[in-house]
Every structure is written in structure tokens, then in C-alpha cells.
Curated annotation (Swiss-Prot):
Compartment(s) where it occurs, according to its Swiss-Prot or TrEMBL record: Cell inner membrane
Cofactor(s) for this UniProt protein: heme
Similarity-based family: Belongs to the cytochrome b560 family.
Cytoplasmic compartment spans: 1-26, 90-109
Name this polypeptide is given: Succinate dehydrogenase cytochrome b556 subunit
InterPro entries given in the database record: SQR/QFR_C/D, Succ_DH_cyt_bsu_CS, Succ_DH_cytb556, SuccDH_FuR_B_TM-su
NCBIfam families for this protein: succ_dehyd_cytB
Keywords: Cell inner membrane, Cell membrane, Electron transport, Heme, Iron, Membrane, Metal-binding, Transmembrane, Transmembrane helix, Transport, Tricarboxylic acid cycle
UniProt function note: Membrane-anchoring subunit of succinate dehydrogenase (SDH).
Organism of origin: Paracoccus denitrificans
Length: 130
């Protein structure tokens, strides 16, 4: 059977035209940071297990943790922890019915990103200064 209304149907937005809202991007990032925290947990767990295993195992694990790759993983995990924590707090406000309007969700997304970066930088400063 022929479709007589073929030209009158609405078209989907093209992927190059459609932009995800910032709230959607931060929601996706919350899921990604939750999974990325595993990398830091694995590295710290390996370091702690090596500390009670033998001096040679600890020396190897300690070298990895203190290397530039270990620093990047631990710093990224620390940022992911702050991001995930702040996103969880924002979600509690959503559950209570606050901040659900588009403009409020956009502002809370901006605050989430800025807050996580500021807290991560402050944590690094405290870690290296004190």
C-alpha cells in the first residue's frame, strides 16, 4: 500500500545540526566518571596490596603510582570523584523537585563542571603544599 502522506511527515534532526543540552552532557559524564573511578580504585588497591606483599612488589607499584601515568590516573580519578559527588548532590535536588526547569538545569550543569574543577585544583594544591 502506498504512503500518500510521505512528504508531510516530520523529519528527525540531523546529527550535525542537533546539539545535546549541557544537562544531557553532564548526565552522560556522570555515568562515565562513575565507571572511570574504577581505574583509580584499581591502582590504589594494587598499591596497598603490594605494600603488604613484599618490598619488591611495593617498589614496583610505588614506581607506577609515582610515575606521570599514575599521577594522571590518580588526578583524573580525584576529579571524577568530585564531579560524581557534586552530580549526586544535584540529583538529590532533582529528586526533591528543585532545578528541573531548563535554565536552572543549565546553570546547575555549569556549576557542576566549574565546581568539580575548582575542588580538584584545591585538592591538588592542598596535596602538594601541605
Amino acid at each position: 500500500m502506498a504512503d500518500v502522506n510521505r512528504g508531510n511527515r516530520p523529519l528527525s534532526p540531523h546529527l550535525q545540526v542537533y546539539r545535546l543540552p549541557l544537562a544531557a552532557i553532564t548526565s552522560i559524564m556522570t555515568r562515565i566518571t562513575g565507571h572511570a573511578l574504577v581505574a583509580g580504585i584499581v591502582l590504589i588497591t594494587w598499591w596497598l596490596v603490594a605494600a603488604v606483599t613484599s618490598p619488591g612488589a611495593f617498589a614496583c607499584a610505588d614506581w607506577v603510582v609515582r610515575s606521570w601515568l599514575g599521577f594522571i590516573i590518580l588526578t583524573g580519578s580525584m576529579w571524577a570523584l568530585w564531579y560524581h559527588l557534586l552530580a549526586g548532590l544535584r540529583h538529590l535536588f532533582y529528586d526533591a523537585g528543585y532545578g528541573l526547569e531548563i535554565e536552572q538545569a543549565h546553570k546547575s550543569s555549569q556549576a557542576l563542571i566549574a565546581g568539580s574543577v575548582v575542588l580538584a585544583v584545591l585538592t591538588l594544591i592542598v596535596f602538594f603544599v601541605f
